[in-house]
From Swiss-Prot:
Protein name as catalogued: Homeobox protein DLX-6
SUPFAM superfamilies for the chain: Homeodomain-like
Keyword Transferase attached: no
Pfam families found in the cross-reference section: Homeodomain
Keyword DNA-binding recorded: yes
Keyword list, A-Z: Developmental protein, DNA-binding, Homeobox, Nucleus
Location of the region described as Disordered in the Swiss-Prot/TrEMBL record: 1-31, 109-131
Organism: Mus musculus
One GO molecular-function entry: DNA-binding transcription factor activity, RNA polymerase II-specific
A GO cellular component annotation in the UniProt record: nucleus
Biased composition (Polar residues): 1-20
Biased amino acid composition, Low complexity: 119-130
Length: 175
């Protein structure tokens, strides 16, 4: 059997009656992987196979925590922008905010200050192996109403949004 017949992630989630044999070295009984309504199950019952847990970098966590301190809920455009700037999917950002709100409410019920439980950016939030990284953006400048020149926001990505007549302009050099 080829590898694609073993991996449930390579099969179509839209085919609700799809079934594939798992490894042939199971001697006691043949197990089948069944996909029903988008849920992957062994022998048609039991626990779902879950995607692996997302591991966030210290920079991503710092930016997510900083944004959560500003607002606990993101509008769709804000979520899309934050996800793109951090190299995450919108779903990952959405789930992170849901989990953070849940943790925040749980800490409030326990009577502790939820802001104290979060490590301060740039201190314990970074592991010993993580280099000190600059913030993704300077929120303090934008919060004070300081106007920024056009195309200065995230210069590394500004060329994605340029119109066709701007293609002749000099793009920032990546280091």
């Amino acid at each position: 059997m080829s590898h694609s017949q073993h991996s449930p992630y390579l099969q179509s989630y839209h085919n609700s009656s799809a079934a594939a044999q798992t490894r042939g070295d199971d001697t006691d009984q043949q197990k089948t992987t069944v996909i029903e309504n988008g849920e992957i199950r062994f022998n048609g019952k039991g626990k779902k196979i879950r995607k692996p847990r997302t591991i966030y970098s210290s920079l991503q966590l710092q930016a997510l925590n900083h944004r959560f301190q500003q607002t606990q809920y993101l509008a769709l455009p804000e979520r899309a922008e934050l996800a793109a700037s951090l190299g995450l999917t919108q779903t990952q950002v959405k789930i992170w905010f849901q989990n953070k709100r849940s943790k925040f409410k749980k800490l409030l019920k326990q009577g502790s200050n939820p802001h104290e439980s979060d490590p301060l950016p740039g201190s314990a939030a970074l592991s010993p192996r993580s280099p000190a990284l600059p913030p993704v953006w300077d929120v303090s400048a934008s919060a004070k109403g300081v106007s920024m020149p056009p195309n200065s926001y995230m210069p590394g990505y500004s060329h994605w949004y340029s119109s066709p007549h701007q293609d002749t302009m000099q793009r920032p050099q990546m280091m």
